[in-house]
Amino acid sequence: MCLIMETDDHNGDVLAPPSNFSMVEDGIYRSGFPRPENFSFLKTLNLRSIIYLCPEPYPEENLKFLEANNIKLYQFGIEGKTDPPTPMPKDTVLDALKVLVDVRNHPILIHCKRGKHRTGCLVGCLRKVQSWCLSSVLEEYQKNAGLKWRQRDLNFIEAFDIVSLRQCLLSIMYQYHGYGFKRRRLAYEEENVKTPKPQAARV
């Protein structure tokens, strides 16, 4: 994948996105693990939150960046081992989805180590909530995972039960707002949505 790099006119910094960076939809982004050289680019996204899908502690340098920019960190420790393979924990993915679909956390970045498998599973489950057809969901996962896509990830996405998520988030719904074309957006009722508790946040 080719990195897009440009110059920030305000301070002359070179803006380099994290590996495998892309927009999922308005206000939702995905990538591999951000490095210090990516911080200037991340600042342009005006992030409110980051979903981190690895069990390892977040680097101190990254935590300082989050604190300086008032970004909340939600950590959901999902093992990425392949030998032996670690099953994707449904309850953990469900908890991460609750954070992801709450617009009060947007703009939000999802990342794991490489932004392919754990991130791809979470985005795939989001697409099912958005009522994407399964073939398109799996195609998106494979496109982002490249040659290293995993059949067990596809099986997890296919089997993921979105009914349980919808039952937990009755007050969150999708509405369409048209500006020449219809755009999907999340809405919520403030009094009915419980604020998820960050597992690691320094804000």
Curated annotation (Swiss-Prot):
Residue ranges occupied by any Tyrosine-protein phosphatase domain in the UniProt entry: 20-169
Site (Transition state stabilizer): 118
Compartment list: Nucleus
InterPro entries registered for this protein in UniProt: PFA-DSPs, Prot-tyrosine_phosphatase-like, Siw14-like, Tyr_Pase_AS, TYR_PHOSPHATASE_DUAL_dom
Tissue expression summary: Highly expressed in roots, stems and flowers. Expressed at low levels in leaves and siliques.
A Pfam family this chain is assigned to: Y_phosphatase2
Region (WPD loop important for active site topology): 76-88
UniProt-recorded name of the protein: Inositol diphosphatase DSP3
Annotated source species: Arabidopsis thaliana
